[in-house]
């Protein structure tokens, strides 16, 4: 889905009419979530669980953060496994993701990215997924998303917030982008990471610091050095905030002839793939997209337009560059040590 414009009004203190009209539904949504979390009895996994989650619906950059944390922990000798819901996939799990066998329609796009870095499990029931990961050899679990899911106890919870958009109009879904009230989320957070550049996240950062929650800043950087010498490019993306991807490309020196955006987790049709191929030829441009979008094009039938688009498009793998990363890792190490002493 595309985020409604009234979720992020140009005037930060204004409340658009649509948000006011939908506020009662937001109240019901928030109340249902609080009741669900209040009644839940979280199951504790046999290994430490680190959660990387969002406060808002849409893309805040949590997956690059999860990948960066995994790389740091693997370098320390941890047997890291990812656990995720697999948004957009048909599998309920628990199931271990196999990139050679599974497509995005099976397990979702993000699990395919995670599986390239560490063993990854998709499970609608997180506690069952954690148990499956432990049986599969996990020594530590990173849960990508699931901050609002009360089924599995977390040993260290990280909230990821986009610095450029913050908490938007501050309303709950569907009146705004919030999955829960800010104070409720902060009461369970051990760290806050602001991704990207901007000041819209300053307010929640101040509230986090007032509670003694450490705040870290992060920017997205390519995992490998890109070669943009043979531009221009037609960039396309179906992610939460595609403009962030386009901005990153420009900052890296790419000449963008055109950009084409799709809804988050969009499954490309044959006609859409063909239109992208034709438009790139008309512009004399090379195609470039995100790793997530490329994951959704994988396993397309050979010679189909989607297969040709997958073959033609350059993809930009990214990781989060987290400021004061050693401090964050030290706090995670402490939480992991405490969990193992239980």
UniProtKB/Swiss-Prot annotation:
It holds the Pfam family LpxK. GO terms for biological process: lipid A biosynthetic process; lipopolysaccharide core region biosynthetic process. It comes from the Bacteria. GO terms for molecular function: ATP binding; tetraacyldisaccharide 4'-kinase activity. InterPro entries: LpxK (IPR003758), P-loop_NTPase (IPR027417). Keywords: ATP-binding, Kinase, Lipid A biosynthesis, Lipid biosynthesis, Lipid metabolism, Nucleotide-binding, Transferase. GO terms for cellular component: plasma membrane. ATP binds at residues 56-63. Pathway: Glycolipid biosynthesis; lipid IV(A) biosynthesis; lipid IV(A) from (3R)-3-hydroxytetradecanoyl-[acyl-carrier-protein] and UDP-N-acetyl-alpha-D-glucosamine: step 6/6. Signal peptide: none annotated. Its EC number is 2.7.1.130. The keyword Transferase applies. It catalyses: a lipid A disaccharide + ATP = a lipid IVA + ADP + H(+). Transfers the gamma-phosphate of ATP to the 4'-position of a tetraacyldisaccharide 1-phosphate intermediate (termed DS-1-P) to form tetraacyldisaccharide 1,4'-bis-phosphate (lipid IVA). PANTHER family: TETRAACYLDISACCHARIDE 4'-KINASE (PTHR42724), TETRAACYLDISACCHARIDE 4'-KINASE, MITOCHONDRIAL-RELATED (PTHR42724:SF1). HAMAP family: LpxK. Belongs to the LpxK family. NCBIfam families: lpxK (TIGR00682). This is Tetraacyldisaccharide 4'-kinase. It comes from Parvibaculum lavamentivorans (strain DS-1 / DSM 13023 / NCIMB 13966). The gene is lpxK.
């Amino acid at each position: 889905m595309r985020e409604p414009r009234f979720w992020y009004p140009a005037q930060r203190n204004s409340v658009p009419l649509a948000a006011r009209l939908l506020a009662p539904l937001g109240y019901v949504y928030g109340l249902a979530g609080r009741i669900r979390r209040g009644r839940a009895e979280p199951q504790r996994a046999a290994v430490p669980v680190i959660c990387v989650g969002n406060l808002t619906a849409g893309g805040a950059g949590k997956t690059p953060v999860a990948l960066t944390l995994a790389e740091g922990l693997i370098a320390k000798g941890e047997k890291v496994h990812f656990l995720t819901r697999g948004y957009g996939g048909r599998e309920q799990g628990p199931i271990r993701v196999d990139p050679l066998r599974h497509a995005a329609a099976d397990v979702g796009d993000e699990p395919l990215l995670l599986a390239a870095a560490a063993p990854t499990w998709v499970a609608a029931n997180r506690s069952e997924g954690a148990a499956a990961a432990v049986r599969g050899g996990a020594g530590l679990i990173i849960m990508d998303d699931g901050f609002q899911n009360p089924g599995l106890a977390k040993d260290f919870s990280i909230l990821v917030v986009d610095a450029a958009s913050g908490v938007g109009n501050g309303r709950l879904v569907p009146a705004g982008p919030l999955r829960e009230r800010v104070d409720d989320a902060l009461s369970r957070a051990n760290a806050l990471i602001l991704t990207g550049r901007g000041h819209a996240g300053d307010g929640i950062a101040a509230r986090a610091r007032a509670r003694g929650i450490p705040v870290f800043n992060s920017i997205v950087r390519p995992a490998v050095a890109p070669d943009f010498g043979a531009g221009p490019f037609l960039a396309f993306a179906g992610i939460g905030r595609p403009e962030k991807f386009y901005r990153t490309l420009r900052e890296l020196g790419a000449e963008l002839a055109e950009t084409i955006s799709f809804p988050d987790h969009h499954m490309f049709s044959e006609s859409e793939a063909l239109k992208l191929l034709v438009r790139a030829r008309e512009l004399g441009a090379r195609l470039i997209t995100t790793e997530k979008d490329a994951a959704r094009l994988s396993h397309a039938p050979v010679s189909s337009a989607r297969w040709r688009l997958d073959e033609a498009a350059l993809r930009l793998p990214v990781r989060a560059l987290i400021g004061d990363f050693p401090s964050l890792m030290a706090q995670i190490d402490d939480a992991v040590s405490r969990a193992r002493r239980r």
